[in-house]
Amino acid sequence: MFRASLPGVALYQAEYDLYLDFTYQYGIGAWRTSRMRTRLLAGQFAPACQALLDYRFMTSARKEGPGWEPYQWDAAGRPKRWRYDCSTPGNKVCRGVWTRQQARHAACMEAQ
């Protein structure tokens, strides 16, 4: 399913592995609609690596505490989904999400 989403795209093994790892974490639906995939299909490999850094948010149906911001609203204009930016320096909420994306990005750029 993953390989079929990149028809005609030749990747180094390191790139393939890290994008597949991303897909394991976020799901094939997120992969299929990602800027990474769009860039790869266009032959833009370095911008695809940069797009890895877009995935730095943790989401919730309620505001969990300070730093959470609404990003989806219901028909009445009330927040219905909240997110936290995991790249916030010193955060103790989801630091691992950001460090994992940074590691993927570094490995991707190294493969270029």
Q: Model segments located where?
A:
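Long, amphipathic alpha-helical surface segments
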Residues: 29-112
